[in-house]
Regions:
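Glycine-rich oxoanion-binding loops at beta->alpha junctions
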Residues: 1-12, 39-84, 93, 99-100, ...
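Glycine-rich phosphate/diphosphate-binding loops that line cofactor/substrate pockets in enzymes
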Residues: 9-22, 74-83, 203-213
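Short glycine-rich or small-residue beta-strand-to-loop segments that form or flank ligand, phosphate
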Residues: 23-30, 84-91, 122, 214-221
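Conserved phosphate/anionic-ligand binding catalytic regions in large, soluble enzymes, centered on
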Residues: 24-39, 154-161
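FAD-binding core of FAD-dependent oxidoreductases
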Residues: 31-35, 66, 91-93, 163
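Conserved strand-to-helix beginnings and helix N-cap segments that scaffold or border functional pockets
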Residues: 36-37, 72, 97-101, 133, ...
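Alpha-helix capping and helix-loop boundary segments enriched in small/acidic/polar residues
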Residues: 61-69, 73-74, 91-99, 120-123, ...
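Active-site phosphate/pyrophosphate-binding segments
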Residues: 111-262
Length: 262
């Protein structure tokens, strides 16, 4: 459970980055970025880039693919803007974010020099070990820890998700309080008929035992598309072992009614 002191540290770091940069690239893959991406998309104006005044940095994502076009175009688009980065990886050796970070790091160092670049890069990684922890120590990056007992896909309420969200202007204190309220509503001692999490788990298990192997999550707002992607990460990675588990898929309605719903 994140403490008020940890929230303050995340907010302070976010303010520091925001004072230095107009664009902040968040580098990660899978659970290391999908939680933050889902919350950011769900809580943001989809047309905010058209507003004349930007009072918060623009948050972009990298390291979630190996497309050379994507990285080239990202760096080209950010040339006119002051740049910073948040790199998220437990080990620092996951291929996609490792490649993206090397390229973004080189861009920042070329622009500002190594000393100034170190102020513009924050690493979220293991407390003691791993390639990214070693590099962060050598370069003097500010760092936050990925807790040992929390997998990446569950980490949105740790600095993994909270730092990118705070940079984007999301009130992370309110977000955490909302999660705490929901945790109380779904605690193990809450009766079945009042507990939506237990009801959902029971329904999934009953249908799985009847032979249903595919579950489709439908959303009705484009801003929830990445909530669906995060949901697929949560269930696909958690249950998809040894040929077991329900296959998670998603549709965005009403658009997908004209394809998947035919």
């Amino acid at each position: 459970q994140i403490t008020p002191a940890q929230l303050d540290a995340v907010n302070d770091c976010a303010k520091s980055l925001a004072s230095l940069a107009e664009v902040i690239v968040v580098i990660g893959i899978g659970g290391s970025y999908l939680g933050a991406k889902a919350v950011l998309e769900a809580m943001s104006d989809p047309f905010q880039l058209l507003h004349k005044k930007q009072d918060k940095p623009i948050v972009l994502f990298a390291g979630q693919n190996l497309s050379e076009d994507y990285l080239y175009e990202l760096l080209a688009a950010t040339k006119p803007y002051k740049l910073a980065a948040i790199v998220i990886s437990k080990s620092g050796t996951t291929t996609e974010p490792a490649v993206a970070f090397r390229i973004v790091k080189e861009e920042i160092e070329t622009r500002y020099g190594k000393a100034e670049a170190a102020k513009r890069i924050v690493a979220v990684t293991d407390a003691k070990r791993g390639a990214l922890r070693t590099l962060a120590t050598q370069e003097g990056y500010a760092t936050f820890v990925i807790p040992d007992d929390i997998g990446g896909r569950y980490s949105v309420l740790t600095p993994v998700g909270l730092l990118p969200l705070a940079v984007a202007g999301i009130n992370i204190g309110e977000l955490v309080r909302g999660a705490q309220d929901m945790a109380k509503m779904t605690a193990a001692d809450v009766p079945f008929d009042e507990n939506p999490a237990v009801q959902y788990a029971a329904a999934r298990n009953a249908l799985y035992k009847k032979g249903y192997k595919i579950e489709i999550l439908a959303s009705y707002d484009p801003r929830l598309q990445y909530v669906s992607e995060w949901w697929k990460q949560l269930y696909g990675e958690s249950e998809g072992k040894e040929g077991k588990g329900i296959f998670p898929a998603s549709v965005t309605l009403t658009a997908d009614l004209h394809s998947m719903g035919q």
